[in-house]
């Protein structure tokens, strides 16, 4: 690591990335400008991001496919988190690379790391889901989702109801060594999307 550079982690909220693909494409371009501003000021940046709306949409789509096709097994939420890391990372890294090139910065590679985090299988968070995912619903829609799909729904800041899932405390980043290697080599890394994919030993 260049000692002259200040290493910082930027955490982007999933809601700030928009609720649709076009919204996300627009949001990441704005975000990329702010991040590259920091790089030009001499900062070494690592990007993390939320995924609440995105992972919910992916999960809903995969669940709908499973309901329509008896031969299509249900997709675990962990796989949906991995999908969200990949597609958010894809948009972010392309926007960042474009912004870097627009400023004639060609020596900073951008990479997305699919990231897992080790959690305790006995974490009480598994029994008290609290992380909102997916889109907002009315109270009536939320009741249908609970009855029909077994989702746990909660009101979210007076804006409507959303599905909530467990959010266990991360104990260790599984890919931390790989992330360090990339950052130390001068790459702009996007990692730990959605807090990481929770795994147990």
Language-model segments: residues:
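Ligand-binding beta-strand-loop-alpha-helix segment within the catalytic cores
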Residues: 65-189
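Short, ordered loop/turn segments at secondary-structure junctions
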Residues: 13-15, 51-53, 60, 115-117, ...
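N-terminal glycine-/serine-/threonine-rich phosphate-binding loop
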Residues: 1-48, 57-67, 76, 181-186
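Short, basic, glycine/proline-bearing loop/turn elements
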Residues: 16-22, 159-166, 200-201
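Conserved mixed alpha/beta catalytic, RNA-binding, or beta-rich assembly cores of soluble enzyme
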Residues: 16, 173, 188-201
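Short acidic, glycine/serine/threonine-rich loops at helix termini
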Residues: 20-22, 56-61, 122-128, 200-201
């Amino acid at each position: 690591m260049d000692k002259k550079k200040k290493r910082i982690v930027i955490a982007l909220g999933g809601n700030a990335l928009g609720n649709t693909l076009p919204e996300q494409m627009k949001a990441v371009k704005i975000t990329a400008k702010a991040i590259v501003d920091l790089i030009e000021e001499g900062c070494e940046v690592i990007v993390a991001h939320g995924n609440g709306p995105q992972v919910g949409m992916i999960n809903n789509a995969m669940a709908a496919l499973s309901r329509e096709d008896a031969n299509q097994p249900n997709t675990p939420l962990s796989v949906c988190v991995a999908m969200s890391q990949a597609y958010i990372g894809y948009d972010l890294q392309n926007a960042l690379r474009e912004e870097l090139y627009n400023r004639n910065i060609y020596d900073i590679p951008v990479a997305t790391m699919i990231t897992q985090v080790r959690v305790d299988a006995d974490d009480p968070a598994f029994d008290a889901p609290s992380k909102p995912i997916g889109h907002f619903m009315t109270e009536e829609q939320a009741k249908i989702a609970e009855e029909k799909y077994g989702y746990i729904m909660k009101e979210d800041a007076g804006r409507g109801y959303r599905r909530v899932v467990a959010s266990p405390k991360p104990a260790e980043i599984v890919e931390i060594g790989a992330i360090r290697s990339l950052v130390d080599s001068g790459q702009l890394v996007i990692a730990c999307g959605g807090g990481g994919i929770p795994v147990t030993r």
